[in-house]
């Protein structure tokens, strides 16, 4: 007994006419008749009483109709449950990311997600950490990748990604380039190039200088790492950045110097997740791929 046979049987029972039933299930009348006959042969009893003018259910047919309708309803419910999940994954996944987040190969991650869920639209927003945190908390973003932060009032979940030291970048002709280390006190009065205060590396740098008890001057503020590195190349200032910035092609030729003294400067990145609401199905799927990629 096959589901298709039950569908054919129910169509004939409801239409009480083989031609109309065949049109309803989009098969030929001969094909429908053959399907019903095969079902009757399997059950070893007639299901319909046929005349030239009418088609009526037999007692066995009436008994089968109740169970057939129940079976087909269960199959539809199962399909709808799966379709509901697939429907959510056909929606939109809003992802926020700060530039050059450590411990994350976002293009590869999003490519894997797109391959696994090709009908889901990915909306990627590149913003500063503070804005990303607000976006997740307010529901504008499903998930974000940013610097580790703990702003007042934030009650979300942070899943650590990476932790790395921060280094000073300067042009080869700068006075600090003569050594691979520099005391915090030596940095007082130096013009710095840094990100907007909304960005994670800027927050980490500000915290490091506060911890060291050194006041610094941010001469130029940027919103992208490429501009920052170009300005350092042009000797318009130095920069305190996450170590992986120094390995970028645009940083080639710059000198990396490790600050030392009252504590060390570190940059930490994390996945920003909501706490007040459940993760969206898309965000859960992305997190699963991230764990597979990082082995965590």
What is each of the regions a protein language model found here?
Residues 90-152, 222:
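Central regulatory/effector-binding core of bacterial HTH transcription factors
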Residues 40-62:
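A short LG(V/I)-centered, amphipathic sequence patch enriched
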Residues 147, 176-177, 182-183, 191-212, ...:
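Secondary-structure junction motif
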Residues 255-296:
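A late-sequence structural motif
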Residues 39-40, 113:
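Conserved amphipathic alpha-helical core elements
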Residues 128-141, 147, 198-257:
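Hydrophobic hinge/microswitch elements
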Residues 155-192:
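Flexible hinge/capping segments at coil-to-helix
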Residues 12-31:
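Short helix-boundary/capping micro-motifs
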């Amino acid at each position: 007994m096959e589901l298709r046979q039950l569908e054919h049987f129910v169509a004939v029972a409801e239409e009480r006419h083989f031609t109309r039933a065949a049109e309803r299930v989009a098969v030929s009348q001969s094909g429908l008749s053959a399907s019903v006959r095969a079902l009757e042969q399997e059950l070893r009893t007639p299901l319909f009483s046929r005349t030239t003018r009418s088609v009526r259910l037999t007692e066995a047919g009436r008994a089968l109709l109740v169970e057939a309708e129940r079976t087909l309803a269960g199959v539809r419910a199962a399909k709808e449950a799966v379709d509901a999940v697939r429907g959510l994954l056909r929606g939109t996944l809003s992802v926020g990311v700060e530039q050059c987040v450590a411990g994350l190969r976002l293009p590869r991650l999003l490519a894997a997600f797109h391959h696994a869920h090709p009908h889901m639209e990915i909306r990627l927003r590149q913003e500063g950490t503070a804005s990303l945190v607000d976006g997740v908390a307010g529901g504008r973003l499903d998930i974000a990748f940013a610097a580790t932060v703990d702003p007042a009032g934030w009650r979300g979940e942070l899943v650590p990604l990476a932790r790395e030291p921060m280094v000073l970048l300067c042009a080869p002709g700068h006075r600090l380039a003569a050594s691979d280390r520099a005391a915090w006190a030596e940095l007082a009065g130096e013009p710095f190039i840094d990100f907007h205060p909304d960005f994670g590396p800027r927050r980490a740098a500000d915290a490091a200088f506060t911890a060291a008890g050194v006041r610094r001057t941010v001469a130029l503020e940027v919103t992208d790492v490429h501009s920052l590195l170009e300005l350092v190349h042009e000797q318009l200032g130095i920069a305190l950045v996450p170590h992986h910035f120094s390995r970028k092609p645009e940083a080639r030729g710059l000198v990396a110097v490790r600050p030392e003294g009252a504590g060390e400067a570190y940059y930490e990145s994390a996945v920003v997740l909501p706490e007040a609401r459940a993760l969206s199905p898309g965000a859960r799927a992305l997190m699963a791929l991230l764990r597979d990629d990082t082995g965590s």
